[in-house]
Amino acid sequence: MGAAASIQTTVNTLSERISSKLEQEANASAQTKCDIEIGNFYIRQNHGCNLTVKNMCSADADAQLDAVLSAATETYSGLTPEQKAYVPAMFTAALNIQTSVNTVVRDFENYVKQTCNSSAVVDNKLKIQNVIIDECYGAPGSPTNLEFINTGSSKGNCAIKALMQLTTKATTQIAPKQVAGTGVQFYMIVIGVIILAALFMYYAKRMLFTSTNDKIKLILANKENVHWTTYMDTFFRTSPMVIATTDMQN
């Protein structure tokens, strides 16, 4: 659950920073009328993720783009070295970007500016737009809560979607491993119980069904100093046969 908790914490931190940056740098607010509305949000393979849409709109699309990038950079800087080590693989899987821990911020900035300033995005004048994400996983018993922040512009929403693709890709990498890890732990516990039960039955059988002579031998074998007469007494417990002298004479 620790990994799932860290993902959720990162998602929450990222959303808070995006809202704050949009408000500070792009004069966005929840009360501003949005030129673009989110019609539908599709997750093709949803395995335990919840989604809400929040409006933080403004008229300055370029400032929105810069605000989103600034929030992403600050959030990445706050990750632990272990968390940062996973990020390049997430970029490759989600955005097909080849990057490294040291260049990930610059590479993401270049990707967003090139993609979100393209004519396909800028010329999109649809007032109601749909957002499609491939897949998202929640940890067992703990759904991942996502927040898509609608900036009110195609540019800003393009950058938000890029970040959403990264965070959902992180859930697909970690949550299934947690499920698999839980299964391995379960089987290891079962195997351990079986081994202990077998050992118990073995010793119980030795103690309950071993002959009296064998029990005495086992007990004596565990003693450090045993007088030889004790062994004699043990091995000759059966009374000797008495042969009459008359029989021998006959």
Swiss-Prot record:
**Do you know which InterPro entries this protein is assigned to?**
Virion_mem_poxvirus_L1
Impact noted for substituting residue 158 to S: 60% loss in virus production
- Residues with N-myristoyl glycine lipidation? 2
A GO cellular component annotated for this chain's UniProt record is: membrane
User: GO biological process: any one?
Assistant: virion attachment to host cell
Which keywords fit this entry according to its UniProt record? Disulfide bond, Host-virus interaction, Late protein, Lipoprotein, Membrane, Myristate, Transmembrane, Transmembrane helix, Viral attachment to host cell, Viral envelope protein, Viral penetration into host cytoplasm, Virion, Virus entry into host cell
What is the role of the protein in this entry?
Component of the entry fusion complex (EFC), which consists of 11 proteins. During cell infection, this complex mediates entry of the virion core into the host cytoplasm by a two-step mechanism consisting of lipid mixing of the viral and cellular membranes and subsequent pore formation.
| Protein name per its UniProtKB record | Entry-fusion complex associated protein OPG095
Q: Which organism is it from?
A: Vaccinia virus (strain Western Reserve) (VACV)
Gene for this chain: OPG099
